[in-house]
C-alpha cells in the first residue's frame, strides 16, 4: 500500500471578503487573477501583490463579472494552507514570503534596517516548493 496524496489545502482555511482596488475606475483584480497572491492596499481593500508588498493571502473568488467594475468583492483565503505562484528570488522550504510582481510571492528579504516601523513584512512558512512555478505556504 502506497502513501496517499494529502490535500493539505483543505486544512484550517479561513476566508474574508474585501473590496477591490481600482485604477482609473477599473477593478485591479479580474477573473483571470483567481489563484494569485494579493496584498492589502488600503482599508478593507485588496489588489494583486506587487514587489515587496505584504502578502495577505490567495484570491479564491470574485462576485459578479469582470464587466461590473466597482460592484465586485473579492474572497481571499487569509489562513490555512495555500499554493501560490512564485518569482525570483524563489523561496525554499522553511522560508517566509513577501509579495512578488504581478500577484506572486518571493523569498522574504533578510531582517535588517529595511524593515518598516510597523514590523517585518514576511508572512507564512513555506512547506513545499514546486521548482520555479509555485510554493505551498501555511499561514
Question: What is each residue range found by the language model?
Answer:
Residues 1-139:
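Surface-exposed, low-hydrophobicity beta-strand/loop segments enriched in small/polar/acidic residues
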Amino acid at each position: 500500500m502506497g502513501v496517499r496524496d494529502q490535500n493539505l489545502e483543505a486544512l484550517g482555511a479561513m476566508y474574508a471578503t474585501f473590496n477591490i482596488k481600482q485604477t482609473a475606475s477599473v477593478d485591479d483584480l479580474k477573473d483571470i487573477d483567481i489563484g494569485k497572491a494579493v496584498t492589502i492596499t488600503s482599508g478593507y481593500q485588496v489588489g494583486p501583490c506587487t514587489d515587496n508588498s505584504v502578502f495577505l493571502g490567495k484570491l479564491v473568488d470574485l462576485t459578479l463579472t469582470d464587466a461590473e467594475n466597482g460592484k465586485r468583492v473579492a474572497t481571499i483565503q487569509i489562513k490555512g494552507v495555500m499554493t501560490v505562484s512564485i518569482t525570483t528570488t524563489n523561496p525554499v522550504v522553511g522560508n517566509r514570503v513577501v509579495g512578488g510582481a504581478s500577484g506572486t510571492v518571493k523569498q522574504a528579504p533578510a531582517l535588517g534596517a529595511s524593515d518598516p516601523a510597523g514590523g517585518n513584512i514576511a508572512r507564512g512558512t513555506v512547506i513545499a516548493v514546486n521548482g520555479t512555478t509555485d510554493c505551498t505556504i501555511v499561514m
